[in-house]
Amino acid sequence: MARTILVIHGAGEPRRRRSKVYWEPLLEESLGRGYRVQAPRMPRPEHPQYWTWARRIDVLIGSTRKPILVGHSFGASVLLKYLAETVRRPALAGLFLIATPFWGPDFPEFALPPDFGARLGDLSPICLYHSRDDTEVPFEHMERYRRVLPHATVRVLDDRGHEFNQAQFPELAADIRGLALQRAV
């Protein structure tokens, strides 16, 4: 049975992807047999609202047995908030977060609860990916996540920008394939 990977895109991304190379469509191919990637369009990506995205994520996760979650940018931050605030957190195989903004008090709709690290302490694995040359989400945001989620695996990259515009994302594919190895041990 194929493992389901749910990829939650960032705000405004479907419009921006039209002319760029992007890793997401090739993720399933790079993972090989045994994986099925779903990348649903989220509601109003040009003007996102947390609750509309959270409801959509709830439906997607609820219809999938122990999914692997991958979020990019705004999508990654919504996944974190959803998982931190969900009373009955669904069973997940792993959480992979790319270029994730750390929303502060200026953005209360998107800000995480102050104790979100403790709330997510039993969620494993969590992998964080961030490029030092990201011009949209400062590298310091990843450092903040690293401090609050000390059990997370952190992958620091140097030349991927914010969009991670490339045909392949070998680090992500390797980490996802590593889940199967962890289960086999």
What are these regions (language model features)?
Residues 89-103:
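A conserved short beta-strand
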Residues 14, 104, 132-137:
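Acidic catalytic loop of the alpha/beta-hydrolase fold
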Residues 70-80:
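Gly/Ala-rich beta-loop-alpha elbow adjacent to hydrolase catalytic centers
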Residues 2-46:
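Short, surface-exposed "cap/lid" segments of acyl-processing enzymes
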Residues 36, 146-163:
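Catalytic histidine neighborhood in serine/cysteine hydrolases
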Residues 138-147:
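Short alpha-helix in the alpha/beta-hydrolase fold that links the catalytic acid
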Residues 48, 160-173:
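Catalytic histidine-centered segment of alpha/beta-hydrolase-like enzymes
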Residues 122, 127-130, 134:
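Short beta-strand/loop motif that positions the catalytic acidic residue
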